[in-house]
Structures are given as C-alpha cells and as structure tokens.
Curated annotation (Swiss-Prot):
Enzyme Commission number(s) from the entry: 1.14.99.56
Name of the featured protein: AA9 family lytic polysaccharide monooxygenase B
Record has Oxidoreductase as a keyword: yes
Known catalytic reactions: [(1->4)-beta-D-glucosyl]n+m + reduced acceptor + O2 = 4-dehydro-beta-D-glucosyl-[(1->4)-beta-D-glucosyl]n-1 + [(1->4)-beta-D-glucosyl]m + acceptor + H2O
Entry's Gene Ontology cellular component terms: extracellular region
Cysteine pairings via disulfide bonds: C116-C120
GO MF entries: metal ion binding; monooxygenase activity
Family annotation (Pfam families): AA9 (PF03443)
Major subcellular location class: secreted
Species whose genome carries this gene: Malbranchea cinnamomea
Industrial and biotechnological uses noted in the record: Lignocellulose is the most abundant polymeric composite on Earth and is a recalcitrant but promising renewable substrate for industrial biotechnology applications. Together with cellobiose dehydrogenases (CDHs) an enzymatic system capable of oxidative cellulose cleavage is formed, which increases the efficiency of cellulases and put LPMOs at focus of biofuel research.
Family label: Belongs to the polysaccharide monooxygenase AA9 family.
Role according to the record: Lytic polysaccharide monooxygenase (LPMO) that depolymerizes crystalline and amorphous polysaccharides via the oxidation of scissile alpha- or beta-(1-4)-glycosidic bonds, yielding C1 or C4 oxidation products. Catalysis by LPMOs requires the reduction of the active-site copper from Cu(II) to Cu(I) by a reducing agent and H(2)O(2) or O(2) as a cosubstrate. Active on hemicelluloses, including xylan, glucomannan, and xyloglucan. Has no activity on ivory nut mannan (INM), a linear beta-1,4-linked mannan without substitutions.
C-alpha cells in the first residue's frame, strides 16, 4: 500500500512531461535526428529518418502489443523507416540522446539488434524471433539505476558487438520505468528502433533469438519489481547478452 500511495504522488507530480524518447543518435561520429512525434507528422513531406515511427512520448505497458517492438501504432508497430544510417563498425561505441528524463522513473536500459534479410526499409519483423540482446544495464550495487545519467542529459552509450557479420540491422533500444511496477501492468517500456548498416570482416551470427512481443510476459523476472521496498538485486528481463565466440 505504501508503494501505491508513494507512486501515485510521484505520478501526479511528474505528469505527461515525464515521458520521453530518443531525440538523436550519434553513430560512428555522425549525428542523426530521432523521429520527432510532435513535429515530423506535421511536415509535408515528413523528414526522412533512420528511426522508425513512434506514437508519442508515452510508454507501452501491454507486453502483448506489437507496439512493444518499436513504439509505433497498433497498425504499424515497427513500420520501416525510409533511411538507414551510414556504415558503422563493430567494436565502436555509439551514443543515444534521450529527451529530459525524470528522476522518479528508475529502471533498466536494454538494447537488441535484428538482422534484416535485405533492405531494412522494407522489413517488418512481426512476431518472428529475430532479436538478440547486445547490451543491458540495471540496478547497481549502490542503489543507482541505469536510467539515472539520463536525468542530467548524459547520452546512453552502447557498443556494436565485435565479430558481428556485416549486413543491415535494426537496433531496438528500450528504457524501462519501474515507478509503478509493484504489479502488472505497471512497468513502463519506452522502445525505439533505428536502422544501421554494419560493416567489417565479422562472421558471427547470433543465436538465442527472441520475439517482440513474446519474450516478455507478466511472469518474466523484472517485469514486476517494487523499487521502493525491494532491496534485492534487480533481474533484467530478457535473454543473456549475446557474446561473440
């Protein structure tokens, strides 16, 4: 009950402005503007992006919804973007800048990739198991969370795995907010997808592929977690991070 009362106060204070999305990516040093849900649809023609459309700055709470994949609408949960980023090199650090993030919205940050069978601008994964996890960060030993640096507008950094075979890929990046996750539904997932071309001489193809929706259920460890009263380590949802052999 205490968790519910405290979270209600947090939610009331935070309001809609507490929500967010990826506003830009810096990939191999080149800057790409994210999909801007409150600007792009009102341009004629809309600007072409490497990011797939999102409905707005709000979260996904229904883990069975196709919107969980990339944050789109029900009829186009991961509608392809018209552009693909210029080639990126495995082993390099990439950066994602979020809009201002509230300090009440604690949670993990998880990043996946999926190989496109051809041009990513013509590919929708649907519910196929095509995703592999490349990075995750959750609750730290000192009680801080992966999401905390975003409060100060610090970009999130991740690395394209070394050894990954060249090709066209979708990067699926998600931020969780657990301020109401003591029950299901309650956890808020903020997914974002963009398209990249990986180059290099890598030969490895990940296994242990998962689907979105499909991988997360109400019973998945980490989906229900009381950040106000649970002092145990946080189990990050999803499969293990893929590690090249």
């Amino acid at each position: 009950m205490k968790s519910a009362i405290f979270a209600a106060a947090v939610l009331g204070a935070a309001g809609v402005s507490a929500h967010g999305y990826v506003s830009k990516a810096i990939l191999d040093g080149k800057e790409y503007t994210g999909y801007l849900p409150y600007e792009d649809p009102y341009h004629n023609p809309p600007p072409e992006r490497i990011f797939r459309k999102i409905a707005g700055n709000g979260p996904i709470e229904d883990l069975t919804s196709i919107d969980l994949q990339c944050g789109g609408w029900q009829n186009s949960g991961s509608a392809p973007a018209p552009l693909t980023a210029e080639p990126v090199t495995p082993g390099t650090v990439q950066k994602l800048q979020w809009t201002t993030w509230p300090d009440s919205h604690k949670g993990p940050i998880i990043t996946y990739m999926a190989r496109c069978p051809g041009d990513c601008s013509e590919y929708e994964p649907g519910t196929d198991a095509v995703w592999f996890k490349i990075a995750e960060d959750g609750k730290h030993d000192d009680g801080s969370w992966a999401s905390d640096p975003l409060i100060n507008d610090v970009p999130y950094e991740f690395t394209i795995p070394e050894g990954l075979a060249p090709g066209n890929y979708i990067v699926r990046h998600e931020l969780w907010a657990l301020h109401a996750a003591w029950t299901y539904p309650g956890a808020q997932v903020y997914p974002s997808c963009f398209q990249v071309k990986v180059v290099g001489d890598g030969t490895q193809q990940p296994t242990n592929l998962v689907a979105f929706p499909g991988e997360y259920t109400p019973d998945t460890p980490g989906v229900v977690y009381d950040i106000y009263q649970n002092n145990e380590p946080y189990p990050i949802p999803g499969p293990p991070v893929w590690t090249p052999a």
